[in-house]
Every structure is written in C-alpha cells, then in structure tokens.
Amino acid sequence: MKVLGIFHKPSLKSVAEKFSEILFDENFHVEYVGSEIPSIEVDLTLVLGGDGTFLKAAHKVRNPLVGFKGGRLGFLSSYTLGDFDKFLEDLKNENFERDIRYFLKAGDFYTLNEVLLIRDPVQKMVDIQIFFQDGDFYFHADGLIISTPTGSTGYSLSLGGPIMLPNVNSFVITPVAPQFLASRSIIVPDDEEIIVRIDQEINLILDGMDFGKVREVNLKKSRRRIVILRPKDYNFSKSIKEKLGYGKRFL
C-alpha cells in the first residue's frame, strides 16, 4: 500500500499533518489530509478521531480503513494516537489482519452500527410490530433499535442489549423505554428480512444521521461492507475489557 489518505476530526488537524509528514519521510504518498473526504482513490484511509468520525469515513469510502482513537471509546479504532510508530512498522511489514464488517440496509439507506426508530419528545408512545420469517413481535415503547454486531457496543448496549462478537451473523432488536418489563432484546439471524411497522410516523436515525420520519421500514443485511485493518495482536475481548470493564477481574 503506497497511496494513503488521512481523514480527521477538526480538532486533530495538527496531529494529522504531523502523521502526513512522517509518512512522506518514509516514502509513502499521502493523497489528502482533511476533515472532508474527496473523491480520490487511495489504498488505505487513516481515520483520526472517535467512532463517530470513523462511521463518517465508512459511509464515504470503499478502501480499507485504519482508525486512531481520538475520542472516548474508539471501538472501531485499531491504534491510539500515541501508537503511530507501531502502526508505521505494521504498515511497512504489512502486518495486518482484515476485520470485515457488513452494513445493514434500511429501505434505500445503509447503516454500519444501528437503525434507531424513535418518537419525538412530545409525541406519545408508539405501537411497533416486527415481522420476520418465524412470526412477529409487538412492542409499546418510545422506539426501537436494530443493531449490527458492530453497533452492539453503542446505543444498543446502553438500552440493555447484549455485546455481540464482531463475527456473529446476527442482529439484535431492542425496544426503547418499553411499557412492559418483559419487552427485552431479541437476537435474530442476519439472513432474515425484517419488516418494522409503527402506528404513527417516528424518526429514522441511521448511525446518528436523521433520515426523516417513517411508519414502515424493511431491513436486511447488505452485501456492502468495509474492511478495517487491525494489528495482528488485536484482541476484541481485551478491547471491551479495557474500554467497558466488561468481564474484567477486579479482585
């Protein structure tokens, strides 16, 4: 890989420029450095920022991505900003594993983390019905979130949803503030086509982006995917222990 791009959140401009200088000195060509992604083909995009910045990049590029944590948690990042020397060695030696993540298609749109269907603050609770191959489920709630394994450590987790390993071929469906205590998350295989119908229009939010109001949405796994480059010593279990304290031995 010789041609690189660097996409960064605005506050990390000086760090991105420093990375670019180092890469140039190491005979790598950096095609662009910026907080916007131009229509230029590169071999690898470096993403400096948090998971939100990484998601923006994932929606705009088709080449492999490698993230540098410049936010709070950075589940999608492979390195910290202080790990650049290690990244440079891995880049020279092509010492990477490919971590493939698939998008979820919601109607005509795509999402990497989750689909959030949520009422307005002054709107009454909604009736939601979910249809899939084996039947249907009903919820009376403020909304619904359908998460990919990638998104399972995000908003879905804060609603009580499970953590899914990245290679699990499933989605998790979790109601938002349901009326009934028994309304819990359900995991469905990702080869299912899911239809969600609501009794009134509510907001459709994909990866934090507002796509207007809907009363029905069809969901299915997309063939569209991204490739995240990870160092060969990357370990997802270690990552969630460090970032969330999950499964960590305290005594």
Swiss-Prot record:
Reactions accelerated catalytically: NAD(+) + ATP = ADP + NADP(+) + H(+)
Protein keywords: ATP-binding, Cytoplasm, Kinase, NAD, NADP, Nucleotide-binding, Transferase
Protein residues bound to NAD(+): 51-52, 56, 113-114, 124, 140, 142, 153-158, 177
Pfam families attached to this UniProt entry: NAD_kinase (PF01513), NAD_kinase_C (PF20143)
Cofactor field: a divalent metal cation
EC number: 2.7.1.23
Subcellular location: Cytoplasm
GO terms under biological process: NAD metabolic process; NADP biosynthetic process
Family (UniProt): Belongs to the NAD kinase family.
A single GO cellular-component term on record: cytoplasm
Catalytic residues as annotated in Swiss-Prot or TrEMBL: 51 (proton acceptor)
Name used for this protein in its record: NAD kinase
Main location group: cytoplasm
Record GO terms (molecular function): ATP binding; metal ion binding; NAD binding; NAD+ kinase activity
Function: Involved in the regulation of the intracellular balance of NAD and NADP, and is a key enzyme in the biosynthesis of NADP. Catalyzes specifically the phosphorylation on 2'-hydroxyl of the adenosine moiety of NAD to yield NADP.
PANTHER family (alphabetical): NAD KINASE
Keyword Glycosyltransferase carried by entry: no
